[in-house]
C-alpha cells in the first residue's frame, strides 16, 4: 500500500516547480517529463540527495531494460491502478535502498497513469545532474559528419563562449541530419542556435508567402 502522505508531499514539489517558487534548476526543461524531472531535482536538492536520486533512477532504468516484460507493463496505459502499483512494489522490493524521492516519483506516476514517461524523466534528470556537476552536454547537428579538425574547432569555440559558462565542462556530440541541407544547429542544455540552411529557406519562404 502506498503512503499517500509521501505521495502528496512529492506532488506538492511538482506544484512548487510549476509556480517557480523553488530554487531554479541549473537547466530549464520542458514538457510533462521535464516538469517531473525538475520537481524531483528540486526536492532532492533540498536534502542534498541529488546523486542518490540519480543513482536510484539508473537502477530502476536498468531493471526495466533487463526485463522486457516489465517495460511492456510500464508502457501499457490500459493497466489498472492495482496492477501498476504491483509493478512499482516489485521494483521497490528489488532495490530496497532506493532514494525516497524516486520511490515517491514512481508512486505519483503510477497514480497518474504516466509510468510510460519514466524513461524520459530519468533522461531529463540526468541532464540536470550533469549540469549540477558542471558538465554540459550538447549537440552540433550537421548535414554531413564533421571532420575531426572542424569538430574540435567548434568544441573549443563553444567551450569558451557564454553559452557554456565559466567553470563548466562541455561534452559535445556530432549528430548528422541530411535534411538540414547545410549549416549547423547547436544545442546546449536549454539553448539552441539554428544556423541551418533548411531554417533559412523556411524563413525565406515565409517572407515570400507573406508578401504575396
From Swiss-Prot:
It comes from the Eukaryota. GO terms for biological process: proton motive force-driven ATP synthesis; proton motive force-driven mitochondrial ATP synthesis. Residues 1-17 form a transit peptide. Keywords: ATP synthesis, Hydrogen ion transport, Ion transport, Membrane, Mitochondrion, Mitochondrion inner membrane, Transit peptide, Transport. InterPro entries: ATP_synth_OSCP/delta_N_sf, ATPase_OSCP/d_CS, ATPase_OSCP/dsu. GO terms for cellular component: mitochondrial inner membrane; mitochondrion; proton-transporting ATP synthase complex. It is found in: Mitochondrion; Mitochondrion inner membrane. It holds the Pfam family OSCP. Its main location: mitochondrion. GO terms for molecular function: proton-transporting ATP synthase activity, rotational mechanism. PANTHER family: ATP SYNTHASE DELTA CHAIN. Mitochondrial membrane ATP synthase (F(1)F(0) ATP synthase or Complex V) produces ATP from ADP in the presence of a proton gradient across the membrane which is generated by electron transport complexes of the respiratory chain. F-type ATPases consist of two structural domains, F(1) - containing the extramembraneous catalytic core and F(0) - containing the membrane proton channel, linked together by a central stalk and a peripheral stalk. During catalysis, ATP synthesis in the catalytic domain of F(1) is coupled via a rotary mechanism of the central stalk subunits to proton translocation. Present with 32400 molecules/cell in log phase SD medium. F-type ATPases have 2 components, CF(1) - the catalytic core - and CF(0) - the membrane proton channel. CF(1) has five subunits: alpha(3), beta(3), gamma(1), delta(1), epsilon(1). CF(0) has three main subunits: a, b and c. Belongs to the ATPase delta chain family. This is ATP synthase subunit 5, mitochondrial. It comes from Saccharomyces cerevisiae (strain ATCC 204508 / S288c) (Baker's yeast).
Amino acid at each position: 500500500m502506498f503512503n499517500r502522505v509521501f505521495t502528496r508531499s512529492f506532488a506538492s514539489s511538482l506544484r512548487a516547480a510549476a509556480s517557480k517558487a523553488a530554487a531554479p534548476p541549473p537547466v530549464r526543461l520542458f514538457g510533462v517529463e521535464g516538469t517531473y524531472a525538475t520537481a524531483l531535482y528540486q526536492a532532492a536538492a533540498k536534502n542534498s540527495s541529488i546523486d542518490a536520486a540519480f543513482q536510484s533512477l539508473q537502477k530502476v532504468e536498468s531493471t526495466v531494460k533487463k526485463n522486457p516484460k516489465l517495460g511492456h507493463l510500464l508502457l501499457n496505459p490500459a493497466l489498472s491502478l492495482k496492477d501498476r502499483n504491483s509493478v512499482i512494489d516489485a521494483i521497490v522490493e528489488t532495490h530496497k535502498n532506493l532514494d525516497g524521492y524516486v520511490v515517491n516519483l514512481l508512486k505519483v506516476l503510477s497514480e497518474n497513469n504516466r509510468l510510460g514517461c519514466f524513461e524520459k524523466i530519468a533522461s531529463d534528470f540526468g541532464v540536470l545532474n550533469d549540469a549540477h556537476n558542471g558538465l554540459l552536454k550538447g549537440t552540433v547537428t550537421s548535414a554531413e559528419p564533421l571532420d575531426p579538425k572542424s569538430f574540435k574547432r567548434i568544441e573549443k569555440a563553444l567551450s569558451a563562449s557564454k553559452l557554456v559558462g565559466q567553470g563548466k565542462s562541455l561534452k559535445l556530440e556530432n549528430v548528422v541530419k541530411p535534411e538540414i541541407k547545410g549549416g549547423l544547429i547547436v544545442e546546449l542544455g536549454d539553448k539552441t542556435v539554428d544556423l541551418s540552411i533548411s531554417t533559412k529557406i523556411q524563413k525565406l519562404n515565409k517572407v515570400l508567402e507573406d508578401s504575396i
